[in-house]
Amino acid sequence: MSDYKSTLNLPETGFPMRGDLAKREPGMLARWTDDDLYGIIRAAKKGKKTFILHDGPPYANGSIHIGHSVNKILKDIIVKSKGLSGFDSPYVPGWDCHGLPIELKVEQEFGKPGEKFTAAEFRAKCREYAATQVDGQRKDFIRLGVLGDWSHPYLTMDFKTEANIIRALGRIIKNGHLHKGAKPVHWCVDCRSALAEAEVEYYDKTSPSIDVAFRAVDQDAVKAKFGLPGVSGPVSLVIWTTTPWTLPANRAISLAPDFDYALVQIDGQAVILAKDLVESVMQRIGAAEYTILGTVKGAELELLRFTHPFMGFDVPAILGDHVTLDAGTGAVHTAPGHGPDDYVIGQKYGLETANPVGPDGTYLPGTYPTLDGVNVFKANDIVIELLKEKGALLHVEKMQHSYPCCWRHKTPIIFRATPQWFVSMDKEGLRQQSLKEIKGVQWIPDWGQARIESMVANRPDWCISRQRTWGVPMSLFVHKETQELLPIERTLAAMEEVAKRVEVDGIQAWWDLDPKEILGEDADQYEKVPDTLDVWFDSGSTSYSVVDARPEFAGHAADMYLEGSDQHRGWFMSSLMISVAMKGKAPYRQVLTHGFTVDGQGRKMSKSIGNTVSPQDVMNKLGADILRLWVASTDYTGEMAVSDEILKRAADSYRRIRNTARFLLANLNGFNPATDMVKPEEMVVLDRWAVGCAKTAQQEILKAYEAYDFHEVVQRLMRFCSVEMGSFYLDIIKDRQYTAKADSVARRSCQTALYHIAEALVRWMAPIMSFTADEIWGYLPGEREKYVFTGEWYDGLFGLEENEEFNDAFWDDVRYIKDQVNKELENQKANGIKSNLEAKVTLKYADDANGTIKKLKLLGEEVRFIFITSQFVISEQAGGIDDENIQYNAGNTTVQAVVTRAEGDKCPRCWHYTTDVGKVAEHADICGRCVSNIAGNGEQRKFA
């Protein structure tokens, strides 16, 4: 017999070598949908302990970008890993559907409400637009392999959710947190609406920087404070500002109580400013000669009055902790209608909250003759000219600084005092209770705690009212004359009645409502509040409107919120505020934040730079599993770099993992775990070591999943596939797997190990490379559920005992020695020994302090299979080994590998060189071992 191929157990599997993910994944998705995989998982996990990851709703506008993909994939990895950990982890995706961006899109296409159609028709078009956006994004999220209740997501525009948002506000009102006030809020003149903190972005802007003198009303009183009654010339207090347009609203000048303020003589007049800033101010205003006449603490100047340069009234000097020495003069222009710090101190001193600016950003009539009707950003030059005319301008220059802008229009915004509704941070202790609750939450990474604590500690009251058309109505009634809210009990009853109607007909029910239907005879005295709720209230109240309401959550609170790091001031904040205001507790147990995506050079993604990466393109070219593997392998706690090159590296890693899985499957051909499994105690020692290796890897992988360290999962998975399996175990077993008798213990032991490893590996992969894990699952032998996602981590792993002779420590030493032997074998290729099986290795040793060599000797003939050489001899060197040739030194054991050409002839069946080829007449061209494996009882293997 010259062709022995038919006698070999060659690997065979239908599992393709190439993933072809972009082509195969859509077919798998179709099967998942047809089978209702999400429903199957829910049924399988019913009754288990719950883990609820509550989805922060993306905005229903535009196609998904790479940041969306990162977010949804991270969530999916957690949900799937929790399922494998024995939890029932339902995932209900959501969308944020109200608000300005959708209004702008509809306006661009159809015009503003009231122009070509009614507000009701406009809302209907907004609802229709949002629904189409949801459908588009949903398809892309599903294509990512994210499992969830995509047929029944939550939308903030669902009638029931809209009704529950109104009920959430009612609970907050009941708990005493709502108040009305004319406070300065971020105002976009293009939106003509207040903006939330999270809707404000900062860009560089050039503004005029001016120093302005406010002359003292009672000159003698001011001079007396400094103990200098004889000062010549008028005395003024100097302020500095970069917003000259706010000067008409000035109502005070703020000083720091503990700073030293100097009276400085210049050019026939005296000016007051912070002593530490005198030198820089004098340089700025060009005063070459000046004299500091005296100093006093800021507190000494409190309530002295100074004349406004052009408004015709005088203003007091007041004391505030917000005054700094970072820039300016140490005297702060204070306009309570145009800044939160100014407002707070204005309230303390009973100042007027003047608001001379209309919603369109122009001065209201009666402000000042040359300013009435002028846009505030065009008014700076007019104000500067006024100051020059009045002799009050000491200096003007241009400066570039960071300025707040609208997130949609990218145009500068203003602080503007308008009648708005606020959730009070302090009236009922919301700030303190929130800070207390923050400490009970696990923040991942842990720096998130300090970040949100700082934000909560310093944030102003939350302005929740908006002057928009497309949003959830506040559903409040106020008295026509006093503007007071309807008495509390009646307010709550009215809100519940409105909520019931909204639950049936949506938010339009509020605008269609005749107040008489609810208020009866009192309707003539009250009017409906036209404001809608801030969209951050919509999404922030979902712990109540969605989590508490959905039956699959069974009344459990959310375990985790997971979003980008910008959401500390966004969704994490609004959710915390609302939950604490409603229930007195945080809405989440854990909060995980991920960084933003950047390109390979660390630059922010930008269409103008052209460095964006489209998730749709990646899925169409490489497949979703490559995108998922990139997300998992990147440390999400910092910026997440992505580029074609980085994705190519992810694809390379994927191939290594896939090749390992394919090797396992191909060598499980013909293996039936029900009949062919070998008991652990009867297995070859090396096979038990391999299963133990998987057990150790699984412990570390599960620990990493539990800690949400997914890049650690991928690294450990790669080490297992490439190092422990690929470069050691899988190479060694090829000879035994291919050449031993098909049903011998030697081969079945090996297959048993491969089976256990494959069962574990496919589960480790499932949360990350979900499509590939599903594909592998379909090729694994043995009875099993239809999907890997319905089960749990594999519990059939075992390993070597520490007290065994050939324990893990021994195999660690063997692997090290093998690495050194392989280096010498590589060196000998230049001398004509082209393959390891052409070699004979003599392992020389001088001592054996840790007993490794003694154990190697006990392996007998089988030691050569570990080193994949035809012959392997161990030789003691009584005279010691030359230090230069030491290749292994651990525990005082030193060895040297000497490689020579193997003796004998090559066996065409097993490719080993041996001296007994042709010794059996019936099989004259093969070795004795192969004869035994073909025609005899087969070789016995105990160790390798």
Curated annotation (Swiss-Prot):
This protein's record includes keyword Protein biosynthesis: yes
Cofactor: Zn(2+)
Cofactor remark from the record: Binds 1 zinc ion per subunit.
Pfam families xref list: Anticodon_1, tRNA-synt_1, zf-FPG_IleRS
Residues that bind Zn(2+): 907, 910, 927, 930
Biological process per Gene Ontology, one example term: isoleucyl-tRNA aminoacylation
Reaction it catalyzes: tRNA(Ile) + L-isoleucine + ATP = L-isoleucyl-tRNA(Ile) + AMP + diphosphate
GO cellular component, one term: cytosol
Recorded domain comment: IleRS has two distinct active sites: one for aminoacylation and one for editing. The misactivated valine is translocated from the active site to the editing site, which sterically excludes the correctly activated isoleucine. The single editing site contains two valyl binding pockets, one specific for each substrate (Val-AMP or Val-tRNA(Ile)).
Annotated family: Belongs to the class-I aminoacyl-tRNA synthetase family. IleS type 1 subfamily.
Name of protein: Isoleucine--tRNA ligase
Native species: Salmonella typhimurium (strain LT2 / SGSC1412 / ATCC 700720)
Gene name, Swiss-Prot/TrEMBL: ileS
